[in-house]
Amino acid sequence: MGLSQSTELGQASSPEELSHMLAERFATKCFTPLELTHFKDNFFTRAAGQGDVKYWNEKILSDFLAIPDSSDAECPLDAGPVIFRMVSYLGAFPFQNTLAPSVLTFEAMVKVVVLLTERYGKVLRRARKDRIRLLFGSLADVGRKDIDQPANDGNSKEDKVDSSATKSHAPGFSVDEPTNDDYEDDDDDLALAALESLDAIEVFRHDSRIDKAVYEARISIATFRRLLMLLLVISPLRPLEPVKAYTSDLNEGRMRTVRQQADNILAAFPQEESGGISYRAFAKTIETSLPYLFDPLTPLFEHLLFSRNLNLSQKRDRSDSTDPTDQTSETPLPLSASIMLPGSFESAILNPSIVSHLSFFLPSTNGSKNLLRDNLRLHPIFSTAAHGSSLTSFSHNVLTWQSGTLLLLEGAVAEPSGEQMVTLGAYLPQPWKTGSSAQSSRLSETSALPCLFQLSPKHLLLPGNPSSSIQNPDTPAAYFSNHSGISLGCRIPPASRSQRLVPSPLGAGSLTIDTSLETAEFHVAPFGHNGVFLPAGTSSTSDNATKTHIDIYNLELWGFVPDPGVSSSEKSAIELQKAKWDFEAREAERRRSLNIKAGAGDSAMEGARWLLETAGIIGDSHGRGGGSV
């Protein structure tokens, strides 16, 4: 398999031997024979070597993955050292605490790819789906306390290899809090599952005890910002797409939006007084607010499983069979189409960096993947910049849309220091309903929950409430009325002829927009489980409830549709909306052509009057009249 000869199970006692055996198991169980062949070719045709040891250093890794580093003067990203330190840590799995940073041998890279592409589920029955603890450890700056340790007799083989393999794993800092008390015991499941069949539990637990007794860790803001900027740039990446297509054209304007979104996301992570991000803050924020943040790493490292040197459709000359081909003369693979479809307007809010930010926490409409991973497209429905600030235009464009929608709002908040720009939004997976003028509050089993969010100046996510107790007609996710405007996450008052009541905020979050679409109020509370939206996962009960008044600059609604390139037997929401508009136009023309002064008993007159009565345009013989939007 390209791995060195394994140690017998009964003789395996050291972390090095057990780590080697686990790599063998990963290689045979988690990759197909073809993937393993491509993997070996990619690794060994590029590997540096000293003696019998073949390994990758930082430059080889960055060049292969096309990740910019400090040596690339043309690219403002500098993520190469960050990715290398992550890989050097993960390559020592499950003994990161004693073996990391590891030399990137083939065995180490096998474990890295399995962990970062989440293929470990094929081998590890008890593996948790998330990789949060491993990713935290790979990013954290680690400082060792001054304690008595046995001397290390001689340097290991890994220490003799090119020092560049570990040079960029920068030393960290120590903090004053107790050591790693935030690592819950159940977070060891991934490593324990990896070793339970290798009779190595005690070895691992010893390694874990060393970690908890010796190390203190925080992720530095500078390190995390560099990784976030890379993830924002490559988030649309699909398997086998060239990474350089996303990293080679980063002009000043693009980098400005990337930095803005990276800072907005960073603001969501509570920071320690001593500096950096603790494990507790990191894990809680990722789990509750940014569940898809690290998804781009999967297609990035899947590049290792396809070698351009192995063109199985053509015979190759043996003389160049071992030469790595980083640059190919073949036609490059086409990039994924933009998630934004052309339509009646171009967005004044969305840009590639904001779309990437959205993909870090918004699911597709079926809830199984993130926004960019399910052939989902955004169709422009309504924009105040294009359609005006009219509720009539809003209802014509939005209430006729038979699919989920994404609402985005950009505006300014008046503060003592001046105006501050804010960007809010709502993910509404169910279509708006014209009968009740509200979005359906009943969710199908396969649908995702709605959510309310803030993108800037600080990332904030108010998740949808899964409780069936709030799925009532008077608590819809979204509500529209000509009298009160647009309401999200509010309680709808009962109809009254004597007074006009407005929807009231309910639960942990709500957004109300006035009838002129010029101002909005954003309510956020750290409590309240009786509404459509729940408190943010990072909020504390000691936080204060806030009400933010916003002057709206832009309001946009985008509809969710499948990729037009994917054939489907069902009509798309775009076709259904066009058919509804055509029907409304025909009915309007028919109404204009009605002659209600026709002779008594005329069937045409009776049909015309019935049509007008049904539409609520005129009253019936009993004096009733009116209608709903």
UniProtKB/Swiss-Prot annotation:
Keyword Cytoplasm part of the UniProt annotation: yes
Protein name: Restriction of telomere capping protein 5
Domain of life: Eukaryota
PROSITE patterns in alphabetical order: TLDC
Described function: May be involved in a process influencing telomere capping.
Protein source organism: Aspergillus oryzae (strain ATCC 42149 / RIB 40)
Pfam families (UniProt xref): TLD
Signal sequence segment: none
